[in-house]
């Protein structure tokens, strides 16, 4: 199974693909799509959409995972992240890729074994889990890999119980 994890954002959308076979995880590719701060918002969303479509076409994931939107105190940030998330969901749906959504707590528990793990602990667990020499950068790319790892660990159970 080739799983694409996406950490949505308008300035930076992290993405990472892992392959999960016979209980073993392997990094396929990781990166981030970025948009310039001065670019009009609709153009930023279009650039993210086109970039994600290119990644999907090039790397051919079987499945995808996106973190559920967390509503913090900053409503404007939540709205723009929600729009970037919508762009990602659209690109995945158009490509016919099944999408699964995970709460931040579930991602932390799956990757670090602890729902209270901080960002640094999560990044280190991503590095260790995939056998990488360094933590993937930017942070959004490491976050996307954590989401992909969470899905790779969770998907077999979902399939076994007919929930995928």
Curated annotation (Swiss-Prot):
* Cofactor binding notes: Binds 2 Mg(2+) ion per subunit.
State the organism of origin. Answer: Chloroflexus aurantiacus (strain ATCC 29366 / DSM 635 / J-10-fl)
Q: Please give the chief subcellular localization of this protein.
A: cytoplasm
Highest taxon of the source?
Bacteria
Name the family the entry cites. Answer: Belongs to the RuvC family.
What does the record give as the organism's lineage?
Bacteria, Bacillati, Chloroflexota, Chloroflexia, Chloroflexales
Question: Catalytic residues per the record?
Answer: 7, 67, 140
Q: What is this protein called?
A: Crossover junction endodeoxyribonuclease RuvC
UniProt keywords (A-Z) are:
Cytoplasm, DNA damage, DNA recombination, DNA repair, DNA-binding, Endonuclease, Hydrolase, Magnesium, Metal-binding, Nuclease
